[in-house]
């Protein structure tokens, strides 16, 4: 059920009044009112609370109202708990919001825990809150916290292999809320918990402070963390520059979580924290020193919802609170409060649905643990302690010319992983410094003895170095000669005569791997090739007795330059299980082609588009794993990148191992399609936006483009709806490519059904097709990512292969069963159609393969009827109206004759022919059966209405005759069961010489009916019949309800 109608009252410390009798959801705020230097100040957070309340009002039937009063003492550890008690006594709130300052948060959190009252804050960053013991059981931190910063730092140390020591410097005035102390505390505890030697010192602003800092750094660590105002960092770096500590042996991490140093200020530009109002010499020294500085900040959410939220936040702050806020990372805290309120409402709703109440604070808080949901600040992940996982950014001087700081890495707290942007960190010595170099700190080590070497030792050392240099030179010369020999031998070359074509059944039945370009299942139909076909096939041949795949190159000749020779050598050298093996190339004009390993299962695109193949997620993850392994190897090889990765370039061998093909040999590649062809745009559906736009690429540009292509393939595998599936949109490949190329927010990407897919898989897709190539992970990171959430992927290679083969066998068995059922269904339909065309006995003879002989019948009764005035009626009606009329009439007739022992022979226009007494003989019952049927049809016609002429009466004329006939099947194409003999002609004359709405019968039929004595007949007289002369005929008037006769 939904929440009941609620009144949300924001009671700010004192003065709020709960309306009598109202069922209120009361939210109490304990935040500072005026000090905007706090990110959690009420003028910053208040607009976010108002926006959250409005969002709740749209989602739930809520009656909302604010009650506010003066806010003071919210960052005082003495006044804040008193205000909290007042709030509890006077307003009995359901949720406390704040405080953000650490010391008052500790006091208020203890009270809240005692009251079992949820306390939600996006501040209170201290590590002491991480252990939610009995003092802080109801504290929920939906914003960043110092322990999460520590986790990021530990991950950084692991990446750079810093395992020994670190030094921490921070400012701690002890007269404020100690923000620098509590921020660096998380780093200290995390590093200490990782068994590092961590020393820390408080920076003093008194004279000699910078010298004391550099002395502390020299003595305690090469990896230095500094937390304090930017002026403090400048002072330390200037002194470090003077003492040559910025020579690359040290690295300085500046903990500026809100990124204030990167924002533009009175004396500095955006992204230039080294700029300051100093002398030119000091400014140059600072700029050089900052090359050794890495800045750590929170990560601004990249999702469009956050940008929209921030814009609305600034407007509401100006209109409702009279303050001008600037776009900055401080607004992230307001967004965290917003997401926290919505999280509380969601969990409260669930609690009430489960039979709980708003007063059950502990239960509500416990349900928040481990939550994952998407808020305005992106993906919100709460850990088991109800602390939010936090994302960070590592900034470095990415442009040495301008000195601009740029993101070097992003850290995902939810994934515990660093995603490197591809921008290299400008290490002064080209590599990260060592955290514990030999003899830097442990001077007691005997190996650190710096006694000068003797003359004999120097001579021996020089001789040894000379021999080593001579050996290395000889080896390099030998290797150079062997390389030239290998290039000249052209081991890759295949003569056209060596390739065998023709009847492939002799070697390999079914050769011809289907490398489809069909886009069946997508929203824009099938891709047609230049030849008008819906798929293209991989050409195959035979080389040295083995089936090989042959890719023809649309070039007249290949110039064997040194570059081309090296490309071909590299293709032979690259060997890996998940890359198709390069066998060789033919350069004999006009038969220029590339010869590679043949994979008989076809392409990945074939498999995904084949609905008869059931792919469970174990199988899909196995294919994804193969693809990632292949691309990781390719990116680390001499070839470096693929450049044209798509599902049709991923093939599957006989053991269901996915292999990547069509890589390398850039000199052989060519585009045969015209620039505006449909096929060309369809191939570009996997192409990264930076390649489509044609902008210059960074060093790793093609590798990051491959990652984008991998994301599109990942979406294909996940949804099996074709590349770039767009739910509800019908766009051509050209339109899709143009939208991707434009690069406008929100970026145009395929549709994803988050409810059906693993959330981590969706996140991986989104990271891989990020607009900024630097934000995409590399395949090494992707491999680790997939290994984590593919729990079943740890089986052995043999087990994996057996599972794949078993699934393939199951698919085949299911396919055979489906095809059998389809065959039986089609057989049933064919037999039903045959029984409608021919009599059942005749159809059975044909099914048994027997010849149907013509058969004579001594006595049958034939019925003929047509519509009087049908020609005139047809002339006055449209063809569709005539068809509708006949269909309605004969549907009515067919339903009636099913009640009698008769057989419908045929209908020709408005003529209707029925017989009784054949093909199944029924003795003397044929005449009364036809008579009763004729009376029933005549009765039906009297009430029949013509749709387009409802006031007209349909006039049916009926003729009946009894006599001998011969019946048989005539013709091979569309065979018909026909009647022959004078009886047929006479019956037709009886109908044509009859009258409308009357049944005209012959004397023979009258004699047959008289034997029963229950039919009323009236003599018509002698009637002149064409070709028959005069015949005595009768009108059948009806059937008497007397005692039954023989029938």
UniProtKB/Swiss-Prot annotation:
Record bears the keyword Signal: yes
Disulfide cysteine pairs (residue numbers): 75-101
Effect of residue 526 to A: Markedly reduced phosphorylation, 80% loss of CNP-dependent activity
Residue numbers of Phosphothreonine PTMs: 516, 529
Signal peptide feature range: 1-16
This protein's GO CC annotations: cilium; cytoplasm; neuron projection; nucleus; plasma membrane; synapse
EC number: 4.6.1.2
Single GO molecular function: GTP binding
Protein name: Atrial natriuretic peptide receptor 2
Taxonomic source organism: Rattus norvegicus
Gene name for this UniProt entry: Npr2
């Amino acid at each position: 059920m939904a929440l009941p109608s609620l009144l949300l009252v924001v009671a700010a410390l004192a003065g709020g009044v709960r309306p009598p009798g109202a069922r209120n959801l009361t939210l109490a705020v304990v935040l500072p009112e005026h000090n905007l230097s706090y990110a959690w100040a009420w003028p910053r957070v208040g607009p976010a609370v108002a926006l959250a309340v409005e969002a709740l009002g749209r989602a739930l039937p809520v009656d909302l109202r604010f009650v506010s009063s003066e806010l003071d003492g919210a960052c005082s550890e003495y006044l804040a708990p008193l205000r909290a008690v007042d709030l509890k006594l006077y307003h009995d709130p359901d949720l406390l919001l704040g405080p953000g300052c650490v010391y008052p948060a500790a006091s208020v959190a203890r009270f809240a825990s005692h009251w079992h009252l949820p306390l939600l804050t996006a501040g209170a960053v201290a590590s002491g809150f991480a252990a939610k013991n009995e003092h802080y059981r109801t504290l929920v931190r939906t914003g960043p916290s110092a322990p999460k910063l520590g986790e990021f730092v530990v991950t950084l140390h692991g990446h750079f292999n810093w395992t020994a020591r670190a030094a921490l410097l921070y400012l701690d005035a002890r007269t404020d809320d100690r923000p620098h102390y509590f921020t660096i505390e998380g780093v200290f505890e995390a590093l200490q918990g990782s068994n590092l030697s961590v020393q820390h010192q408080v920076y003093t602003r008194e004279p000699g402070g910078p010298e004391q800092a550099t002395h502390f750094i020299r003595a305690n660590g090469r990896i230095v963390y500094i937390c304090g105002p930017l002026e403090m960092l400048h002072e330390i770096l200037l002194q470090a520059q003077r003492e040559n500590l910025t020579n690359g042996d040290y690295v300085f991490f500046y903990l500026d979580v809100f990124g204030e140093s990167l924002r533009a200020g009175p004396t500095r530009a955006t992204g230039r924290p080294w700029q300051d109002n100093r002398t030119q010499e000091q400014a140059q020294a600072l700029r050089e020193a900052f090359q050794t500085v890495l800045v750590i900040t929170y990560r601004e959410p990249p999702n469009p919802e956050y940008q929209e939220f921030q814009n609305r936040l600034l407007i509401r702050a100006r209109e409702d609170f009279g303050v001008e806020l600037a776009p900055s990372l401080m607004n992230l805290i307001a967004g965290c409060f917003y997401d926290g309120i919505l999280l509380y409402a969601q969990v409260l709703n669930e609690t009430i649905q489960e039979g709980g109440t708003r007063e059950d604070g502990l239960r509500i808080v416990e349900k928040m643990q481990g939550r994952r949901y998407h808020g305005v600040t992106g993906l919100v992940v709460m850990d088991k302690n109800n602390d939010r996982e936090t994302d960070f950014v590592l900034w470095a001087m990415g442009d040495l010319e301008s000195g601009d700081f740029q993101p070097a890495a992003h850290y995902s707290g939810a994934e515990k992983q660093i995603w490197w942007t591809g921008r290299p960190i400008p290490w002064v010595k080209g590599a990260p410094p060592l955290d514990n170099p030999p003899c830097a700190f442990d001077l007691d080590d005997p190996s650190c003895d710096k006694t000068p070497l003797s003359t004999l030792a120097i001579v021996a050392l020089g001789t040894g170095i000379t021999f080593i240099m001579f050996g290395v030179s000889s080896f390099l010369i030998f290797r150079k000669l062997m390389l030239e020999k290998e290039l000249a031998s052209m081991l890759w070359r295949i003569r056209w005569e060596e390739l065998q074509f023709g009847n492939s059944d002799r070697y390999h039945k079914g050769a011809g791997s289907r490398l489809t370009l069909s886009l069946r299942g997508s929203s824009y139909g099938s891709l047609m090739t230049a030849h008008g076909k819906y798929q293209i096939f991989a050409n195959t041949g035979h080389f040295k007795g083995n089936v090989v795949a042959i890719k023809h190159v649309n070039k007249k000749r290949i110039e064997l330059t040194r570059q081309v020779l090296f490309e071909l050598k590299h293709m032979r050298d690259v060997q890996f299980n998940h890359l198709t093996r390069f066998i060789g190339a033919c350069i004999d004009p006009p038969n220029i082609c590339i010869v590679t390993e043949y994979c008989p299962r076809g392409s990945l695109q074939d498999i995904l588009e084949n609905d008869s193949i059931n792919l469970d997620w174990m199988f899909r993850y196995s294919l994804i794993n193969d693809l990632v392994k292949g691309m990781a190897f390719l990116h680390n090889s001499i070839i470096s990148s693929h450049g044209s990765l798509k599902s049709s370039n991923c093939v599957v061998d006989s053991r269901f191992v996915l292999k990547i093909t069509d890589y390398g040999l850039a000199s052989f590649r060519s585009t045969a399609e015209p620039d505006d062809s449909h096929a060309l745009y369809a191939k570009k559906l996997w192409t990264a936006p930076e390649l489509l736009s044609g902008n210059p690429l960074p060093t790793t540009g093609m590798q990051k483009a491959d990652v984008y292509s991998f994301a599109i393939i990942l979406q294909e595998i996940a949804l099996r709806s074709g590349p770039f599936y767009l739910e509800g949109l019908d766009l051509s490949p050209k339109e899709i490519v143009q939208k991707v190329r434009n690069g406008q927010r929100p970026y145009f990407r395929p549709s994803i059904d988050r409810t059906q897919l693993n959330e981590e898989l969706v996140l991986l897709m989104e990271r891989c097709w990020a607009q900024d190539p630097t934000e995409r992970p590399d395949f090494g990171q992707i491999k680790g990512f997939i290994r984590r959430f593919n729990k079943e992927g740890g089986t052995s290679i043999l087990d994996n292969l057996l599972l794949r083969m078993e699934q393939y066998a199951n698919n085949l068995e299911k396919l055979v069963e489906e095809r059998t059922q389809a065959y039986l269904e089609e057989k049933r339909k064919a037999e039903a159609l045959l029984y409608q065309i021919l009599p059942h006995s005749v159809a059975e003879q044909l099914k048994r393969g027997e010849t149907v002989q013509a058969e004579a019948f001594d006595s049958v009764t034939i019925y003929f009827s047509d519509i009087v005035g049908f020609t005139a009626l047809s002339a006055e009606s449209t063809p569709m109206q005539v068809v509708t009329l006949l269909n309605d009439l004969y549907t009515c007739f067919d339903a009636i004759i099913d009640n009698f022992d008769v057989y419908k022979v045929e209908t020709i226009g408005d003529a209707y022919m029925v017989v009784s007494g054949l093909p199944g003989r029924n003795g003397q019952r044929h005449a009364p059966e036809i008579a009763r049927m004729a009376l029933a049809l005549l009765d039906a016609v009297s009430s029949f209405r013509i749709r387009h002429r409802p006031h007209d009466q349909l006039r049916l004329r009926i003729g009946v005759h009894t006599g001998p006939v011969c019946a048989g099947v005539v013709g091979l194409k569309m065979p018909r069961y026909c009647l022959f003999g004078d009886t047929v002609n006479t019956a037709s004359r009886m109908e044509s010489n009859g009258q409308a709405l009357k049944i005209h019968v012959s004397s023979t039929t009258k004699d047959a009916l008289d034997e029963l004595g229950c039919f009323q007949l009236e003599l018509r007289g002698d009637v002149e019949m064409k070709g028959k002369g005069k015949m005595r005929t009768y009108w059948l008037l009806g059937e008497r309800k007397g005692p039954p006769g023989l029938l």
